[in-house]
Amino acid sequence: DGKEYPSLAEKVFQQASKDAAKSDNAHNLNYILPYINTAINKFPDNIWLQLNKAKLLLALGRNDDALAFGLTVTKSKVNDYWAWELLGDICAANTPDIALSCYCKALLSSNDDKFTGKVRLKLAERMAERGDYSSARGEVERVISYRESEGQRIPEDATRLASQPWYREATASSSN
């Protein structure tokens, strides 16, 4: 059929880096980093290795290093909300205005509440930090409303944001 499939070694590197990126153990994150570098050199077209390296560097607090990989991923997956969310996460510590823009772009890329709850809450957090409480409340309410309608648990971040004094005082904007 003419398709190329990744080698077993490439799949192993990809899965190991994905699992490591979920860890909060700095020793494990630092341990796998040279292996990911080797894998990226060996398989430069594998965007998932670049994604996992960006996540690893972000978990290690190396946001400036993560940015280059995050940009590569976002350029490759420009229409995927999660790529913009990753870029927002990378930018959040040093450039919160850019993070806000990335989260907005993520929601423009996908309006499906099934997938966008986390990014909506991150956007609400940034909006609240800027004093845009009505918009922040609107985002939190949308997440809560969707979760309740689906019979799902309300995320801790939504509960935390909804318990803030600004939330009680704000009137939700109908659209952001």
Regions found by a protein language model. Give the residues of each.
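Helix-turn-helix repeat elements of alpha-solenoid scaffolds
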Residues: 1, 20-34, 55-65, 92-101
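Amphipathic alpha-helical repeat scaffolds of TPR domains
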Residues: 1-23, 42-55, 79-89, 117-125, ...
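Extended, charge- and Ser/Thr-rich helical segments
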Residues: 2-12, 33, 39-41, 55-72
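Tetratricopeptide repeat
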Residues: 30-33, 40, 67, 74, ...
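Short coil turns that delineate tetratricopeptide repeat
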Residues: 44, 77-78, 111-114, 148
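Extended, charged alpha-helical interaction scaffolds
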Residues: 67, 77-86, 100-103
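TPR/TPR-like (Sel1-like) alpha-helical repeat modules
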Residues: 103-109, 127-152
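Charged, low-complexity interaction regions that mediate assembly/partner binding
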Residues: 146-176
